[in-house]
């Protein structure tokens, strides 16, 4: 039993360009918008944040309410103006930790017409999440239809154009599907996003498959919203820098409960769901090549740890492995600061992840198998030098070298941010499947 929604990215504005709104996303938008109506007293719907201001803003159910304005507004000199109508509010802050320069908790200024405003910049080209905090209540921007889900929240998105990686270009575009499937491993329905390359719907060709995993703070929406994965692939494929491929972005969290996302139970549940349900679903419902040479996996932060936990017990199925801002999470107690995504805290959490020695022992059959090593075409790591997990990555790379692997390790500038993760995807994807022919299996 499955529910499969194919989405053309030509309907609704997004920070990375255009994408459709899924039923799940639409529900989240409605909930967030209703919260804002209570705070701001307006029901005006959003305008495209990448366009110039319109003469007359759209009307809500009660007609045009409040002053006419646009938010966010990106100027040609790469400044961003954020605005919100909240005439009764005492304080409004911008929550946008992803924006360089730390825009977290920036105070907006209130005008006589009840519109609060803040301009920041110049900001480097990119897609950025933000919310408003209105008298202690977090809310999305009601004038902006572009949103991005996280694991426990919904964010507004703003795009500062000028990125060669993911700006919308006049090239053939693929499609993104939101797919709901029944997980037999977890006995519940789950969702994943699937990118298919330009021409997939009209053709019969089979494609390589790339499984791309998100981090602890996100869900399966993240790579296609703030991560801009579809547009990055569109542009790489159009430039003949990457092979056309199907990209599968599953949900990384198996529970919203208290379990650590890198703890043993959560890790085991994810691997079981991935191998038992996600991969078989994709191989049944999509025209993918299923041999090892045409299968890749990568992930960021928590997803990087999950990548290693999936790939090495099943190394006969993956020829390309990518780890972004991550490693064997929690395996090296002195390698990273305590906290989510880092090493265990001073008081170990319940159900801690395996130590490095335990992980090596559990995966000895793959780590010391010469034939499996030979079939692994790429083991690729990249982490920013300011990233809190840089020492975890370095220790993980050394572990694989000790077992005779030849990992590629790129230390980039920057930290634990989407700015880096989009770059890592754009560097990793062109290295995939270049030795295999389209539509064939080795």
Describe each region flagged by the PLM:
Residues 1-26:
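N-terminal secretory signal peptides that target proteins for export/translocation
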Residues 27-43:
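Bacterial N-terminal signal peptides
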